[in-house]
Amino acid sequence: MPKPAIKTAAKPATSPAGKRAKPNTPQSVAKLKASTAKAASKPKAKLGEKKTLHPRNVHLHGYDFVALMASFPKLKAFVRPTAYGALSIDFADPLAVKNLNAALLKQHYQIDFWDIPKGALCPPIPGRVDYVHYLADLLFEGATAPRVEQVCALDIGTGANGIYAILGQQVYGWQFVASDINPQSLANVQRIIDNNSCLQGHVTLRRQRDENAIFKGIIEAADRFELTLCNPPFHASLREASEGSQRKVRNLQLSRGEKPKATGASLNFGGQAAELWCQGGEKQFLATMIRESHMFAEQCLWFTSLVSKQENLKPCYQALAKLGVDTVKTIEMQQGNKVTRVLAWSFHSQAKRLRWRSELVTPTE
């Protein structure tokens, strides 16, 4: 069996989101064109400069706190000047980070309501939307820029924040099926959908009832997905997850010149059990995902997942080779000093992928 080509590149619902995406509206087309034009007008990084966010990421040049406070006045209570005279928030304060997220989602993504329950993972918006932008590039490989298409995506482990479905729908107009094992998390995402008309009819929620399964029980016979995406649990135990959260808080305090102090797991580095850890950690989760992906090879164009630990890539490559995957790609992403990567694989040849994508094109004048 030939080895895959491995490449490295710099209310729970019954709506048919996974069956076929609806055509994008003229408003979503105009929105993407305006967003792409705005990003393209910004200066590009020079050769040799440190890799940062994706060129189309609206957060590439940091946060405009004045504009954010105007858009979301509740943020004002958490903004303060830094020693250098710039405005910022205390990123170790969970309420500050949650309000920053709500402000970013309102200003840049037209989300009027976003909230998460106490103890839920509070995602960094710039890094999460980076993943979405790189998936757009992956889907339209060879094109100079992604086009507005009919795309169905599956978010594995959407959590209580539903962030990938929100960003993918608002930036690119993609349809989403978002799954999770926690019914409380899904109930919160449904609350977000119910309070944002722009998401209604575009995001379907499905509950995973088997803690040992990932795609099984979620992907239905009539489903067809262009992309799957996932931010897997990093840790192998609750203790490991708690230590990781506390370590991040201490490092943040040290970076600000503060004396580290004892603290519980902060919400912005927190998360509920299924969001942060599982038996076997990230390595085992990815192994299960890869094994199950073979069962749905004909229904999904690209399978993808974030990989936080570089040492977990090698066993993934080996498992994918055994399955006879056609193409494997690793996409590196960087935000500040944090480096993570997207592992992507497809059982379809390039010719089949081109034929698949040709069926998505919505003619435009």
Swiss-Prot record:
The molecular function terms in GO held by this entry are: 23S rRNA (adenine(1618)-N(6))-methyltransferase activity
- Main localization is cytoplasm
Q: Tell me, which GO biological process terms does this entry list?
A: rRNA base methylation
Keywords of the record, alphabetical order, are: Cytoplasm, Methyltransferase, rRNA processing, S-adenosyl-L-methionine, Transferase
The reply on keyword Iron is: no
Intracellular or extracellular location(s): Cytoplasm
Q: Name one Pfam family in it.
A: Methyltransf_10
Which EC main class describes this enzyme?
Answer: transferase
Q: Where is this region: Disordered?
A: 1-50
Q: What is its EC number?
A: 2.1.1.181
Q: Where is the composition biased (Low complexity)?
A: 1-18, 30-42
> Which Gene Ontology cellular component terms are annotated?
cytoplasm
- Catalysed reactions, as listed in the record: adenosine(1618) in 23S rRNA + S-adenosyl-L-methionine = N(6)-methyladenosine(1618) in 23S rRNA + S-adenosyl-L-homocysteine + H(+)
Q: Which family does it belong to?
A: Belongs to the methyltransferase superfamily. METTL16/RlmF family.
Function (record text) = Specifically methylates the adenine in position 1618 of 23S rRNA.
**Which NCBIfam families does UniProt cross-reference here?**
PRK11727.1 (NF008725)
Protein name, entry field: Ribosomal RNA large subunit methyltransferase F
- Species of origin reads Shewanella oneidensis (strain ATCC 700550 / JCM 31522 / CIP 106686 / LMG 19005 / NCIMB 14063 / MR-1)
